[in-house]
């Protein structure tokens, strides 16, 4: 397994920041698209998650995220043929050495993934759900933290599973979650949640074997597309290609000595919130620049053109009046006065219209400025 390079850690930081971590941690739901895109088996992903989540809080901080990404890419690029039972020393961050030792003393992955005790061979999973079972799972579903559309995320179902199926380990929950959520959605609908409880209950009560696939009759139910308004995760599907290049580039590097821990100093002092705000500011500046260009290139308004024409006509009539030598001055003066009055009324109307448009323009400029 090639050693972990600094350029690799920096790239993982960019991916981590793009997931919008909270308190410098990302949830399973946030990482789920990357896990799904790896195309690794659910059991493998469950083991990788367990190894990465060193403190066992169900989330990954940046150091744990690096471990998760590196194990995934090593499996995808076939740098390793199986996920190790324990993390190699060079992949363990110095701040978590003691936690890793404590977990190893408690049995590590072997203890976490041990199946419930049962006599003889583990029974097959039963997919049929009786009305009594459905009523029970409906009550459990009501305890989950649901979205407005009734969907449930991984973190929304996990507390209920922990409370009612205490024999279920996290890798087993990960495996069953992937089974009823084959497309790796951030949240699943009510029916997949019911089957999640159904499978976990059998696993917990009688040690039933978790199946590798689902019946064809349920495949469409579990893979059904959901309409989502969450734009935070857009573009995550494109992450995989760029990250795979990182792990591939490290194949030829020599392995780090076993007693050396990973150095995560490359991201010291980095503030992911600053990165996010800088991106938003750059986007707003671009929008403001486009609006200014449109304003400068816009043709004169109809009101401005008409005003210039009427002002020119007014000056012409005034010049005619001052130089008139007609024998009927009173009649000409009266006619010109009426023309001037009419023009002045029209100019007044146009000035009022121009003033209104100017106020509208000022309001738009104020809104543009507030975006910055």
Curated annotation (Swiss-Prot):
Cellular location(s): Cell membrane; Endosome membrane; Cytoplasm, Cytoskeleton, Actin patch
Cellular component, GO annotation: actin cortical patch; actin cytoskeleton-regulatory complex; cytoplasm; endosome membrane; plasma membrane
Topology in membrane: Peripheral membrane protein
Region listing for Disordered, in residue ranges: 242-267
Keyword Transmembrane: no
GO process terms (BP): actin filament organization; ascospore wall assembly; endocytosis; endosomal transport; reticulophagy
An example molecular function term from Gene Ontology annotations: protein-macromolecule adaptor activity
Family note: Belongs to the END3 family.
Residue sites binding Ca(2+) per the record: 53, 55, 57, 59, 64
Summary of the function given for this chain in its UniProt record: Component of the PAN1 actin cytoskeleton-regulatory complex required for the internalization of endosomes during actin-coupled endocytosis. The complex links the site of endocytosis to the cell membrane-associated actin cytoskeleton. Mediates uptake of external molecules and vacuolar degradation of plasma membrane proteins. Plays a role in the proper organization of the cell membrane-associated actin cytoskeleton and promotes its destabilization.
Main location: membrane
Biased composition (Polar residues): 249-267
Cysteines engaged in disulfide bonds, as pairs: none
Official protein name in the record: Actin cytoskeleton-regulatory complex protein END3
Subunit structure as annotated in this protein's UniProt entry: Component of the PAN1 actin cytoskeleton-regulatory complex.
Alphabetically ordered keywords of this record: Actin-binding, Calcium, Cell membrane, Coiled coil, Cytoplasm, Cytoskeleton, Endocytosis, Endosome, Membrane, Metal-binding, Repeat
Alphabetical list of InterPro entries matching this protein: EF-hand-dom_pair (IPR011992), EF_Hand_1_Ca_BS (IPR018247), EF_hand_dom (IPR002048), EH_dom (IPR000261), End3 (IPR025604)
Annotated ranges, domain EH: 8-98, 133-225
All residue ranges annotated as the EF-hand domain in the record: 40-75
Any coiled-coil regions, as ranges: 271-355
């Amino acid at each position: 397994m090639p050693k972990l390079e600094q350029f690799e850690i920096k790239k993982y930081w960019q991916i981590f920041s793009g997931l919008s971590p909270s308190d410098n941690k990302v949830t399973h739901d946030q990482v789920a698209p990357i896990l799904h895109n790896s195309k690794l088996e659910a059991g493998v992903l469950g083991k990788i998650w367990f190894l990465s989540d060193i403190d066992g809080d169900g989330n990954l901080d940046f150091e744990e995220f690096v471990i998760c990404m590196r194990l995934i890419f090593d499996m995808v690029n076939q740098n390793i043929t199986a996920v190790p039972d324990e993390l190699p020393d060079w992949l363990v961050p110095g701040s978590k050495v003691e936690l890793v030792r404590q977990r190893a003393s408690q049995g590590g992955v072997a203890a976490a993934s041990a199946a419930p005790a049962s006599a003889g061979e583990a029974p097959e999973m039963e997919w049929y759900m009786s009305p009594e079972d459905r009523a029970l799972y409906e009550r459990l579903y009501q305890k989950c933290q649901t979205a407005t559309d009734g969907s449930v995320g991984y973190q929304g179902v996990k507390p209920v599973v922990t409370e009612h199926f205490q024999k279920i380990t996290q890798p087993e929950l990960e495996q069953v979650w992937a089974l009823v959520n084959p497309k790796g959605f951030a949240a699943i609908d009510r029916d997949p949640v019911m089957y999640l409880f159904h499978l976990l209950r059998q696993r917990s009560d009688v040690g039933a074997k978790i199946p590798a696939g689902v019946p064809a009759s349920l495949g469409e139910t579990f893979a059904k597309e959901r309409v989502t308004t969450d734009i935070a995760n857009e573009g995550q599907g494109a992450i995989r290609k760029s990250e795979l290049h990182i792990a591939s580039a490290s194949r030829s590097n020599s392995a780090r000595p076993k007693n050396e821990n990973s150095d995560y100093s490359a991201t010291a002092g980095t503030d992911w919130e600053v990165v996010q705000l800088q991106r938003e500011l750059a986007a707003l500046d671009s929008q403001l620049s486009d609006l200014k260009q449109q304003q400068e290139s816009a043709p004169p308004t109809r009101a401005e053109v008409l005003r210039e024409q009427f002002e020119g006509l007014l000056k012409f009539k005034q010049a005619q009046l001052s130089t008139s030598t007609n024998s009927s001055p009173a009649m000409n003066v009266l006619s010109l006065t009426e023309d001037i009055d009419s023009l002045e009324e029209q100019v007044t109307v146009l000035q009022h219209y121009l003033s209104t448009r100017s106020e509208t323009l000022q309001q738009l400029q104020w809104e543009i400025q507030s975006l910055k």
